């Protein structure tokens, strides 16, 4: 059973509702402290909400810690046609706790609240798990907030406390941390991994109305079965490691949860084969990738294919490298509010 990410949100109300704010847009600026009392405030506490940009300190088989950053935003789901973005926050640096400001006048017993990733990837209604992710730094999750990172929760009024709401958020996507290495010293010396493709037997990406339907594929559009992560375009990441080296070349993917039969393709270059792009293909098999969890995939790519996915046969040295590669899969326990086990 998936555990929700829990924290509290506080609502400090004003008397008048500023109807001009009910348009789903807001400022990306930090709200000055002197103005805080003018707004309804959502305050996260007990750990950050659900951040992809700074999922820090993840290691194989463990969760991660998270932090808010200044351009994070929340959305209130008021109705099918009305989603309200906060007008700002009090965040000036990475922090586990933050205040998000909305107009006053909210008195329902509960509100649905969504985190929809970076505003470049949402209009407050839809988010996109994109066909291409661009990861510029090894072992970094910055790109995921542009590619479908999202969460939902219900803010419920706390009994006996005016304007105080508590909410439990849940990550909606599943996440992969892919860590390649090459046990063959002939090919790995100077090798650079350029991109990674994740192929599935069913949809792992698309466009979704998170507030109304979450990541339900029955209500998604632009569904597709593949995701490509382009690495530090066009330079790639080093891949001269003989064993797993997360800091050197870990790749992160955000995708739809569910049962998937995944195949991962690793495209890279080696000085031993000038002008060629090598490809190693690893099938993971059919398994469940739960929402609100990260699955670590450690893959030895020491057998080689050309770009046409056929074995390379250009000499005895290469034939020695044509051994069966290995892949291990480690699923983290579902994260709690700090993304730890």
Language-model features and meaning:
Residues 2, 6-15, 22-341:
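Sec-type signal peptide cleavage vicinity
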